[in-house]
Structure formats: structure tokens, C-alpha cells
Amino acid sequence: MNEEDTDFAWLHNNSAEHLRFLSHRIFIGPIPSNFIHSTSGFFNKRFQNYTKRQICYNVASPNEPPIDFSFLMHKSTDENPDTPSNLDSPSTQNVGSTNNTRASQSLLRRSSSFFRRRHRKNGTHASTDNNPFSESSTLQPQTAERTSQQAVRSAITETTNPSVSVQNSNSTSTSSAAMIIPHRDSQNSLEIAPLISPESQLSSLHPSSSRRHLISTPHVNRGTQFKRSSSCRNSRQPLLSGVDKHLTSNFTDANLIIKQSVVLARIESTFTVLPSDYNDSAAQRVPRKTISPWSQCLLVARQTDVENSIRLDFISKKLRKRLNGDVVHNLDVPHDKSYKSNYLFSVVLSPHQASWNIYNSFDNSMVLWCPYGKNKTLICLLNFQSSLLSFEWISIISRALLFSPRPSLLISVPAFHIHLRLNFPCFKDTTRPHTNETFVTTDDITQLSRTSTLSLSTASPRLVHDLVMKSWDISEDQFVESCLGVLEVNPEWSGIVKTWSKSHTLGLCWRMYDRLEWINSFSSLKYVGLLAAKDLYQLELRPKLHYPNHVTFRDGSKMDEPTPVEGYLIRLTSSTGRKTRYGRMFHKELYFAIFNNFLFAIQPDSVLPLSMLSKSLNLDDKLPFLSNNENDKYVYEFDPFKIANCRASGLNETIDSSVRESFLLLLQAERKRELDMLTIADSFLDLSRVESVCPVEDVEERNIFEITMTNGMKLVFQSYCERTRNLWINKITEVASYWKQRLFLDLQEYHDVRETNINILHIEQSIEPDVACYLNHWEVAGCVASTLIYHYCSMLGCRVIRMQGTLFKKKDALFEKCFAILIPGQLVFFQDATRTKFGKLCTKTHYRKRYSISLKNAFIYTGLSTMDEFARGPNDPQPHISRLPRCYEDGWQSFDRDDMLSFVIWSSGGVDYDLRPHHSVPDTAYGMAKDKLSKPKRFMFLARTRQERDVWAKRISKEINRGHS
């Protein structure tokens, strides 16, 4: 798996300053003993479970490599060589100690002054010297045996099916890597790789089938049998889709699986002859009948003897019931009852009958169509979980249908307003002998050009396809160096290019109007020549910019992003701003942590404090990852880059290997701890809506401060002492000032890009949405796109919060406004607006968590295919009718139609409403227990604008790609 596709790809960038900024955090105050001993019996069990397992797995990405704690074991044995260490039974004898007692709740809540005096007298906040958790911790590395047992019990661990080799009389299975396109050396030999059988993947679709089978084995255990309809058993041998003759070949020879994947399919039919460039925009002018909406099925590509073509088998149990009277064919499928009972239909990729195109360039969905029935055309829309998987299937289908990529392509450099033409040296273009074209000079391509120098007029389309794919087997750095080498030849650009390449990291991206999509992996780079031949995007060379971590105010002053803080506080007001409840003073002990402009509230017994994490790792003094501030004993600063060798450079070869390994292990553990806090957070406070933060002076205690919101609501908090109160006030004030300006600049960037493109095209604002969706890329080649909106942090996953903003979720026939936060592996929703039974909007202080949607094994699609999700009545406005613009509270106006704002998430995990009990163990509490037979759900959303919809869809798709990788 490519390291750039994992959740820790941000560790491999070259900017040491950016790495230090991402990993720097501050913990304020000691750990209050009564926060833990309020439920000492449960916390004992919970903390053992948490510290022994929580750092060893990722909640969102189970495919990430586990953390090696060998250096911790080595450290513990070196310090105490004579003392045996029992890692499986951590020391928790002080957890249930009765020395630190807590006053009765009835005594604490008699009155405001009495509550605070008793609170201080009984030691509500214990110092670190008297706190057993400050001196020792239960965080211990686990053994390999315990890790394997917990991996089986964990509900988050992803299980993979064992690979099953495909047997054939003319070919033998090999143990080589999986091949996308088979290479035929002779007529009787075909190299394939052992793949997972379709039955093993069908077990995930149909949980009732508990056994797996070999496809070509004649005598196997059949397992659960699916009943077939009598119409299919008694029907005669039908015509194969896409071929005008009966199927007479022997499927024993045609059982060679080239590729198989679980896809999302939509099946339609029409009587109209489709154009060769049929796509999402052309579908509006074609009358179609939907045979089956978007549903999950297994797509299998097999080699056949019919015209030496490839056959696509669609397999699904649920779709068979819908398509039984339409397109189900009783073909001589492989001899397996489970395969036959779920078999739908086949499409033979014949160049004379079948056609293909990229249906939606935004979500990389593709469309296949072929003759079907009498004067009918069968349309199959395919949506994939990842862009790389989509490119692989496009490569297979395009090669089978004799689609040959172009031997050259144009690359735009927006910084210099020039275009470069790159030509593949494995071809000799006889039609254009005198051209000033630029050649990519790499060792691989040069060797390929010496062995095969062909003419375009004599080469076959499939050979051209294979040679172009081989020509792109180069790294991104080699490709960028080739482009820069061309620019440096010109004396006019040589000095500028050298300065530009030193100050920025350059990369390749696709551009379509104002949208950018980075090519950030070697696997995606090999399909550039194939996608460029479709003329859907513009390939560009741009600098890779991260999300800005500084702002500039109107007076010219600059401010860096404040360091996020976390710690324990007591909230003395309810969500409605009241200080009393049922005649008693409101009192809630919580753990607060700042991420971006949010102050998240977490239950104290559900989180591992930052100070305990580093002390439990027991690192030596040479690596001061977390230490007390010299001027303030209540401040713990977590800074892994606090080493002199890491000030100038990042994690490169100049650093010692042991130090580099310790860095990576600690940063991964800290990222997983942050992700766990966001997963279990109950609510958050939006600090960008804070008006003022000031201490409360009219009380006897000096450790209380008040936050005033822009809507007039007030929140009261109590800290450990006066010093910690001042620290919280300063940090919250800095975060509020910074993120108010940062969010304003982000919105201004959206507005500037749209206004610039409107002025370039000389169009009205109401026409701009149609231009963005339906014009070709050469018609909008002069428009601009922003790398600050589509920054490189979204590709690497530098920040744990990938996206945030307002979405409108479809609930029955209405849309519910909610606030969404995208984190690795899931999309979390918080309640945005509450109303009374009379419809009056209620004011609130913070956002409560509602539910979350798992992005594991999910799909996302956009465009006109989402219009079927709308439940419209006869009086509802139709999407093609013009309407007044939508106006939002921040001043943004949107003329976009519903189909330009909508996107649908097809999730097999369903919704987690966070119904776990408060006192529960993390192994079994995270997520609602789901039935194995639960149906997948579709969730439809509307964004505020088309620009925000594009960003939401791209980043959600990237998270789905990481989970699929």
C-alpha cells in the first residue's frame, strides 16, 4: 500500500516547520483526583482497557500498521535489569484508593458559595504530587499474544478473505502480484494472478452464505443455496448482451478472472441511440427508464473465446429479484450454484457493439451501453470506492474496446502562463515530422524506445494502449524534473524556474474549471496518459501548498495559529445558559480539548490525558517530548521537535534512525489519541462565535471565568486555580481572534475565485453554475483555480479534522440543517438548530452530537443521478426552473440548482446514534451493535453552494479511498 494513501502520510512531507506545528500541543493543569474517583470502580476497568489497547489500533483506519513498542520494552529493562516487569498486568492498585475522597453531591449543591467553598476545601483539584496518576500510569505496551487476541475481539478490525487461486486446464496459478491487464504470449498461454473468488466477496454481500468455494472445482461444498425462479430455469439459451450470436464456448476455458471488485451499479434502458460522448450532461436530453437504482454488486471481468473479448459478469442477490423480468439471462455460467443463483447478466466488451465513457468526471464514475432486446439500449452506470480502482477498470475496459490513448499530451504551467507538449518516445509520428515537441527523458522510457520504436499508422490500438501505460511507469519527481528541465533550457525562464523549484514543492494535478485534483501516488500517475485522451481535464503543474497557519488582519498585523490546548474544567452552566437545575447549582466535570476553532467536551473517564501519555511511554531525557514549562508548573508542553537536530530539517536521513523511529511512534500514538477524542466527544463550543472571555470577579473563588457568545448566551467555567484560569482565558481569546479571521479569509477566497471567473468569461452570476458543470475544459481554460481551497493538506491528511461546515441532510421529504465534521473514517453530525413546538428558534451555547456515518466500504456519487433521491410533489419547484438566489447569514448568495448542490453517501455501516451507556468498555462501546443482515443506507445531503459541495465530495471521497486502500 502506498504510504501516501494512509492516515499517516503527513509524516512523510519535507517541511519540518509544518510537522512541528501539527504535533505541538499544551496541557493545562494537573489531573483532578475526584474526576477519576467519582467512578473509581468503573474507571479502574476502563483505564486498564484504554491504556493497553487504545494506542494500538486506529478507530478509522484499521489497515494502518501497528505501532512497535519494542523500544519501550528495551527502555524498561535497561533501567531495572533485576526487577521483573509484568507488562500484561499494569499497576492500578492506586486507582481505587480511598485516600482521595469526594464530598457528597447533596452537600456540594446547597448554594453557590457553599458549593465552591466545599469544593475547594475537599480538594476538588488535587495537585500532581498527591495524585497517583501523576507519578505512575497504567499505560503499558502489550505483548504480541495479547495483540492477536484483541485483534480478533475488536469490532473495528477489518478481516480480509483468504485468496483463492483460479484453476484452469491451460494455465496454472502463480503467486505473483495481481495483474490488471493479462499479457498473452501465445494463443494458449495467459498469465493471471490468484485472486479472491467471487464467492468470498459475496459472503460480505450475503451474510447467510457462510462457506466459500473454488470457482473451477467441480466437487465442492455448496453451502447455502439460493432459490432460482422457474422462468430462468426453463428459458431457452438467450443472446449475450453486446454480441449477436449465441454463447457456445466452453466456460471451463473462459474461467480466467482478470479482475473483480465490489461496485455500485445503476441500470437503465432507452430506445434512443446514444452518442459516443454520452455522459452526465448528455443524459438530460435522453429519455431513460430506470430498471434498478444504485445498488451494490460484484463485477467480475473474465476472458472469453467470443471474438477474443472480455466479459463482465454482474453478480448480486438483491438485484436479481428486480431484474428477473428485464435483463436476467440464463447463461452457462461457471459450475457453482452460488454463482448461478446470484448471477444477473453479462456484457461482452465487443468493439462493434459495446461503448464506454466517463459518466461524471467529478466522482470518476463510468458508463457502459450496448444493444439489448428489441431496439433497446442497456445503460450500466458504475461507481467505485476509490479513484485508483476506477482508473484500473477504465484501463481494462478501454483496452478491450480498442481505445488507444494519444502519444502526446499538453501540460499547463499557470505560474508562467505557458503550455508544454510531452511526447512518448516509444512512438514515431510520421504525420508530423517537423515539430518542436518535448520528450520525457527517463531511463525506463529510453530503454523502451530502443526496443520498440513504432509508427502510429501501423501499431494496433491495444499495443498503443500498453506502450502508453508502460511509458508512464515513472515517479512524480522524475516527471516534474523533466518539465523543469524543458523550462530551464530557455534562458528567459532558467533563473525563475530555479528559484521557484527551491521555494516550492511542485506536483501534478487535474483541473476542471475551478476544481483541482492532485495526483499524489505512483499508481495514479500511470493512468495520466489514458485520462488525458478523454479531454475531460487539464493537466497542470502547480506548487503544493498546505493549509495556511497564519492570518493577516486589516491593520497589517500578522498572527500565527495558536497552539491548541486541553485540560480539565468544570462547566457551571447548562446548554441553555442556566446556572441552576432542579433547585441545585449546575455542576459538570469535563475534559476540554481545542481542535481548530472548536472546544470539544469529553467525559473525563473516556480520555487519556496528554500528560499521562508521555509519562507512560517513559522516554529518556534526551527526547524531551513533553515537559513542564520552566516558568509555569501548570503547563505541560508536548513538542516532539524540541531537539536541536530537528530544527533545520524534518524526518530525513540526517537524523539518527532510533530517534526517527521514536518520533514516528510517538506522533502516531498522539494522532490516534486525538482521533479517539474527536470520536467520543459529546459536544463542542464554536470559538469563532465568542465575543469576549473574562474572569468572574463577584465571587469568592478566583478560578472562575465566563465566555460570552455573539448570540448573548454566557457560559461559566471553573478551573483549578487562578493561574490556570488566566491561561485558559488567554488561549481561548487567541484562538477566537485567529479563527474569526481565518474563516473570513477562507470564505473570501471562494468569493474571489468565483468573481474572477465570472469576469474572465463575461457572464452573469446566475449562469455561472451551468458553466461550471456543463462546459468542456478547453472552453474554460482561461479560468483560475485556488490551491488554498484545494490545498495539499487534504491529500496528505495533515489535520485530524479534514472538513467542517454546514450541511442539509434529507430527512423524509424535508432537509434538516446540521453541522458536520469530517474525521478519518467517519462523518460526525452535531445538532445545529433547535426549535420549539411553535417553530421558534432556540438559542444555545454549544452543539450536541447527534450521530455519525461510517465511511468504511462506502460510496459517494453526485450530479443528476442524485435527483432520484428527491421526494418531490406536484407543487414543488423543479430543478430546471430558475429561482431566487439563496442568501446566507455570512453574505454568500447561491444561484445553484439542487442537482449542483447534492451528493449521496451510500454506506454499508449505517448510522451510529451514539447510544452506548455512559459506563462501558471501549472495546464494546464504540459504535452501535449492528445486525449482520442490516441493509445499507443512502444519505443525501445538500451543501450551501456548488463550490462547497465540490470540496465536501472530494474530501469524503479521499477518506473512502484511504479506508479502501
Swiss-Prot record:
Q: Where does this protein have compositionally biased stretches of type Polar residues? A: 82-101, 124-158
Main location, first listed in the record = cytoplasm
Q: Where is the PH domain?
A: 562-737, 800-961
One of the GO BP terms on file: protein localization to prospore membrane
Q: How does it sit in the membrane?
A: Peripheral membrane protein
UniProt-listed InterPro entries: Mug56/Spo71, Mug56/Spo71_PH, PH_domain
**Location(s), subcellular:** Cytoplasm; Nucleus; Prospore membrane
- PANTHER family according to UniProt: PROSPORE MEMBRANE ADAPTER PROTEIN SPO71, SPORULATION-SPECIFIC PROTEIN 71
Spell out the molecular function terms from Gene Ontology.
lipid binding
The protein depicted here goes by the name Forespore membrane adapter protein MUG56
Q: Where is this region: Disordered?
A: 70-175
Q: Which UniProt keywords apply?
A: Cytoplasm, Meiosis, Membrane, Nucleus, Repeat
One short Pfam name that applies is PH_SPO71
Which residue pairs form cystines in this protein?
Answer: none
Q: What does this protein do?
A: May recruit a lipid transfer protein to the forespore membrane during sporulation, thereby aiding forespore membrane formation. Required for meiosis.
Family in the record: Belongs to the SPO71 family.
Here the segments flagged for biased composition (Low complexity) are 102-114, 159-175
Q: Which GO terms describe its cellular component?
A: cytosol; nucleus; prospore membrane
